[in-house]
């Protein structure tokens, strides 16, 4: 069917005679949704409440309200949704997983190119991580115009090609350029994931599914040092990057075969349907042809580009992002610099072998894997932060003391493990809060969250010189104190005044 012949289907999810559009009501009432069916009768009236679609057990109102169309991802089967969540979680691992490979190769690269580990750390790991954050801003602009799937697919293909370039790079400059480009273009799944979860799952299940998705990119920076540290100890650093390229290729293949477009334009009246069906629709959607045809119904370029700037200044978003950015970012900082603490000979470091460093990086992986009403207010999500912050402080202080005073390996493991548990708890709470507060801007929320955590991770640039001069306990203790101060400043304020700010 030609573009001009694009068919449209009227939504049956909202009555024409009603003043309330149930398909977009969750966006209009951002941050405050009626979950209990009985409460809905009081809040919305009997007439509107009788039209609300409920969960299978009849105990919860579904937000967003599903349409009657089989194209609506809210109506997909549980297995179909689970497959898409699995795919986006696998893809979300790629950016930080690839950047983390540099941790395993830092000493071999320094030896091969006759430079210091600090230079290699800054030139490769730090810059590639930094560019992951900025790439997300461009991704969300493209997604608003062309959909989730084509941006996800092409970003992963390009990322795989740049990883291959890093694997085969003949010199350090080429290697660093390939690493940075792979980070910049590969960040799409870390933005798309929040979209996919909210596209497919109703409000009351979103935090649970966000746990699964965030697990992917929280654990990913530690997976590659843990897995490939043993490999680099036996072969060369190129094998580690080659294995990372293979993983990216597997993700691309899975996206090619099984990933689906979850973007559904439920806010348009009537809701536009895809111009093709079957295999042709599959191929055109993957390549971006369908997105080009559907773009005329979606945001203009001006609106897509300006959208991030319309929300970033909001105090309820900016404050919580600074808090989470420092908390998550300092976690990135210790991930990048711990290899130096562990691998440097005494008295500054522990003098671990490549095998010992690789085994130690299994700690945060295990830690994250182990720790997985009527009217709902978004600020309720933030109560989890009261659990996360004390754990974070304990973890950082124990880890700093272990490094400075050369305590047992158990102290290192316990400190790092507790800190990563805290980051997992806090990240899910903050993402869920931001998603609830800005239901029309899930991509922007993901992009700014990604940028905030990366900017917070810039501590790696000065963490090692600081620790050399004043000790690791002071460094990690100050970082924990900064997070605690931001928590006291931001979280109670949002819980008291968040509804008014919204």
Task: Give residue spans per PLM region.
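Intrinsically disordered, low-complexity terminal tails of fungal membrane proteins
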Residues: 1-80, 259-304, 371-378, 501-502
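Extracytoplasmic
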Residues: 80-117, 189, 334-340
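Helix-loop-helix hairpin linking two adjacent transmembrane segments in secondary transporters
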Residues: 216-266
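C-terminal transmembrane bundle
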Residues: 96, 126-129, 133, 140, ...
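Pair of pore-lining "gating" transmembrane helices in MFS-fold secondary transporters
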Residues: 81-99, 180, 313-333, 417-418
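Cytoplasmic helix-loop-helix junction between adjacent transmembrane helices
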Residues: 178-217
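Helix-breaking motifs and short loop linkers at transmembrane-helix boundaries and internal kinks
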Residues: 98, 113-114, 135, 146-147, ...
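Conserved MFS/SLC helix-loop-helix module at the cytosolic interface between two early adjacent transmembrane helices
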Residues: 134-173
């Amino acid at each position: 069917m030609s573009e001009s012949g694009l068919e449209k289907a009227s939504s049956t999810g909202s009555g024409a005679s009603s003043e309330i559009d149930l398909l977009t009501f969750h966006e209009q009432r951002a941050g405050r949704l009626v979950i209990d069916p009985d409460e809905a009768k009081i809040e919305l009236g009997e007439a509107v409440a009788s039209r609300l679609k409920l969960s299978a057990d009849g105990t919860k109102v579904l937000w967003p309200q599903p349409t009657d169309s089989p194209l609506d991802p809210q109506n997909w089967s549980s297995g179909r949704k689970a497959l898409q969540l699995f795919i986006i979680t696998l893809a979300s691992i790629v950016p930080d997983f690839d950047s983390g490979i540099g941790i395993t190769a830092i000493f071999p690269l320094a030896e091969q190119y006759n430079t210091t580990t600090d230079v290699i750390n800054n030139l490769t790991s730090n810059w590639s991580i930094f560019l992951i954050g900025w790439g997300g801003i461009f991704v969300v602009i493209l997604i608003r115009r062309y959909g989730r799937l084509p941006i996800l697919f092409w970003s992963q293909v390009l990322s795989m090609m740049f990883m291959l370039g890093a694997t085969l790079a003949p010199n350090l400059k080429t290697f660093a350029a390939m690493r940075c480009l792979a980070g910049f273009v590969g960040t799409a799944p870390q933005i798309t994931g929040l979209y996919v979860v909210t596209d497919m799952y109703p409000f009351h299940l979103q935090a649970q599914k966000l746990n699964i998705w965030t697990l992917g990119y929280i654990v990913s920076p530690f997976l590659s040092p843990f897995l490939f540290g043993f490999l680099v100890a036996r072969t060369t650093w190129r094998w580690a990057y080659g294995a990372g390229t293979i993983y990216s290729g597997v993700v691309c293949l899975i996206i090619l075969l099984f990933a689906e477009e979850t973007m559904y334009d439920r806010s348009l009246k009537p809701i536009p349907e895809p111009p093709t069906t079957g295999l042709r629709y599959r191929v055109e959607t993957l390549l971006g042809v369908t997105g080009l045809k559907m773009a005329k119904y979606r945001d203009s370029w001006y609106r897509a580009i300006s959208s991030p700037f319309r929300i970033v200044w909001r105090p309820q978003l900016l404050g919580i992002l600074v808090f989470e950015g420092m908390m998550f970012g300092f976690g990135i900082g210790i991930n990048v610099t711990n290899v130096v603490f562990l691998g440097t000979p005494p008295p500054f470091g522990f003098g671990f072998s490549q095998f010992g460093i690789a085994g130690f990086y299994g700690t945060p992986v295990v830690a994250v894997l182990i720790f997985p009403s009527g009217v709902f207010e978004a600020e309720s999500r933030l109560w989890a932060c009261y659990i996360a912050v004390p754990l974070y402080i304990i973890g950082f202080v124990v880890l700093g003391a272990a490094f400075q005073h050369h305590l047992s390996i158990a102290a290192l493991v316990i400190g790092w493990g507790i800190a990563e548990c805290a980051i997992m708890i806090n990240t899910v709470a903050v993402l869920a809060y931001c998603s609830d507060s800005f239901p029309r801007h899930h991509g922007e929320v993901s992009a700014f969250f990604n940028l905030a955590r990366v900017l917070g991770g810039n501590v790696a640039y000065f963490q090692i010189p600081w620790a050399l001069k004043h000790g690791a306990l002071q460094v990690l203790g100050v970082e924990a104190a900064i997070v605690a101060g931001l928590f006291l400043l931001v979280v109670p304020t949002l819980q008291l005044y968040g509804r008014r700010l919204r």
